Design a protein with these regions (language model features):
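Structural signature of tandem-repeat unit edges
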Residues: 2-16, 26-38, 48-61, 71-94, ...
Length: 397
């Protein structure tokens, strides 16, 4: 870079700034962009003295890494665009991948209506950023776009947003979330590690990705009927979550979805047919578990270490049971297995030390390894005539 260059005034006739044009101009303080409509990749990357930039109203593209690493850049201004009188529309604009990554002094940000796409990592690690207001034209927020913006507390979404990318707001400080009715997809890890205590989903939402809200502080959830995909670990480790209502679009609770939600006491899931591995494991105060006549599949450890459960009836509709489903349910007193299962899988009631009553159907033919290990309160087991196999350590302890 031209390390001594301090001021740039571009002529109004110039339309495009090319790739790496001013890359590494470490003394550059002032830039007047004239009527530029395109800024190329890495154009001002590493201009560490640049403190402010004003983008002209005809700008349509800010390239990848264009201002990445401009560590003194604290002010970004977009000139207001006038409506095109022939089309009555604003021109569109994109902000590229990593465009402002690591601009550690940007405090507030207002994205104009003309911006339709924010690239991956666009404002990642902008550590001073506290507030973002998105324009009504924005459709997509890229992966990691605001990830690790550790002071970000306020976000206002526009009316056109459809997609929030992976880790888009992970490890920010957002206390609440209200999504517009247009939002369809929340990507994996999107709000991972945020202190969200309030989440309002819209009825157009379709997908909530894996770990999207892992560890947030929300106390209740109402998932709309439009949601058909709820990813693994989506709300895992949400320690304050006490009540969940799943809409009719959810037919499967994926692996670990509500794992370690230690305050969860109420769950409604009227259309669910499958409960994945460890989906509710370590939900330590969950007493009434969602086993209705729609359920066909219970994954490994689905209710493992749910220590408040006292009674359980596995309905006749269940035909597929994994291992360790009630392992460590130390308050479980009685259990009934329906007619749809033909074996008691390995570790099913392992360490259920208070289990005193068990009812098995005539269809049970085998009892798995460690199935009743350490069931020290179990005085009698009604073994039916159809049982042909009892595996190793089935009643150990």
């Amino acid at each position: 870079g031209c390390s001594t260059l301090k001021n740039i005034i571009l002529p109004s006739s110039l339309q495009k700034i090319g790739v790496r044009s001013f890359n590494g101009c470490s003394s550059l303080i002032n830039v007047e962009l004239g009527h530029i409509n395109s800024i190329g990749d890495v154009a001002f990357n590493g201009c560490t003295a640049l403190t402010s930039i004003t983008f002209p109203n005809n700008l349509t593209s800010i390239g990848n890494y264009a201002f990445s690493g401009c560590t003194e850049l604290s002010s970004i201004t977009f000139e207001e665009e006038k409506l095109n009188q022939s089309t009555l529309e604003l021109s569109s604009m994109t902000i590229g991948n990593y465009a402002f990554e690591g601009c550690t002094k940007i405090n507030t940000l207002t994205i104009p209506d003309k911006v339709t796409t924010l690239g991956n990592y666009a404002f990642n690690k902008c550590e001073a950023l506290t507030s973002v207001s998105f324009g009504n034209g924005l459709v997509s927020i890229g992966n990691y776009a605001f990830g690790d913006c550790k002071k970000l507390t306020t976000v206002t979404f526009g009316t056109s947003l459809e997609t929030i990318g992976e880790r888009a707001f992970s490890n920010t400080q957002l206390p609440s979330l209200t999504l517009p009715s247009t939002t369809k997809i929340i990507g994996d890890w999107a709000f991972y590690g945020c202190p969200l205590n309030s989440i309002e989903f819209n009825n157009g939402l379709q997908t909530i990705g894996s770990r999207a809200f892992y560890g947030v502080s929300v106390e209740s959830l109402n998932i709309p009927n439009s949601v058909t995909s709820l990813g693994s670990y989506a709300f895992s480790n949400c320690k304050n979550l006490s009540s969940v209502v799943l809409g009719t679009g959810i037919t499967k609770i994926e692996d670990y979805t509500f794992n370690s939600c230690s305050s969860l006491s109420n769950i409604e899931c009227p259309s669910v047919t499958e409960i994945g591995a460890s989906a509710f494991a370590s939900c330590s105060i969950l007493k009434d578990i969602p086993l209705n006549e729609n359920i066909t599949t219970l994954g490994n450890g689905a209710f493992k270490s749910c220590k408040a459960i006292t009674s359980v009836t596995v309905p006749n509709s269940v035909t597929d049971m994994g291992t360790s489903i009630f392992d460590g349910c130390t308050e479980l007193l009685s259990a009934t297995l329906g007619t749809g299962v033909f074996s008691v899988p390995n570790y099913t009631f392992n360490n259920c030390s208070k289990l005193a009553t068990i009812v098995l159907s005539e269809n049970i033919t085998s009892i798995g390894q460690y199935a009743f290990q350490n069931c020290t309160s179990l005085a009698a087991l009604p073994l039916t005539a159809n049982i042909t196999q009892i595996n190793n350590y089935a009643f150990k302890g």
